[in-house]
Amino acid sequence: MTEKAPEPHVEEDDDELDGKLNYKPPPQKSLKELQEMDKDDESLTKYKKTLLGDGPVVADPTAPNVTVTRLTLVCESAPGPITMDLTGDLEALKKETFVLKEGVEYRVKINFKVNKDIVSGLKYVQHTYRTGVKVDKATFMVGSYGPRPEEYEFLTPIEEAPKGMLARGTYHNKSFFTDDDKHDHLTWEWNLSIKKDWTE
């Protein structure tokens, strides 16, 4: 079997797809408006209580609605945690390189908080480049979440790191945490090196 380098491919932009599907997200409502709606519908009241909790959410008015705190590459065979702090200096993060051994199975875990209002259609998008050429684009639907003091955690399905001599090397990733309303909650860049071994 011959080894092949990752090939660049073109995917339709999410905005173009939304246009073709004629999808329009529902208008944004404040948390207070949502809590006041359909008060006499018992099943909806229970659902909202499950989503929002019992009491009023006290939020810092200066905080963004969504705060992405960290990204972790979850890999059982890794010698230690592979975690990036997304609350600090994102420019410094661009200069760091994280290592994955070729062919290992891993998942991406994202920790985030919703601070004020319900957010609909959260998604994690990752563009991957090698020597300046886009070689992959992945979009993961994260879902809709209500505000709460605790962090939420999202795990992608299991993926396999590229393998083979031609696949080894450094990949530059541009990651986006966005939603149906096209709010850019966080955009960051980071590097991933695929190596023959963890300690190579």
Swiss-Prot record:
GO cellular component, one term: cytosol
UniProt biased composition (Basic and acidic residues): 30-40
Residue segments, region Disordered: 1-40
UniProt-recorded Gene Ontology molecular function terms: GTPase activator activity; Rho GDP-dissociation inhibitor activity; small GTPase binding
Signal peptide, first to last residue: none
Sites bearing Phosphotyrosine, chain numbering: 23
Residue numbers of N-acetylthreonine PTMs: 2
Residue(s) carrying N6-acetyllysine: 20, 24, 39, 46, 101, 123, 174
Family according to the record: Belongs to the Rho GDI family.
Known role: Regulates the GDP/GTP exchange reaction of the Rho proteins by inhibiting the dissociation of GDP from them, and the subsequent binding of GTP to them. Regulates reorganization of the actin cytoskeleton mediated by Rho family members.
Protein name per Swiss-Prot or TrEMBL: Rho GDP-dissociation inhibitor 2
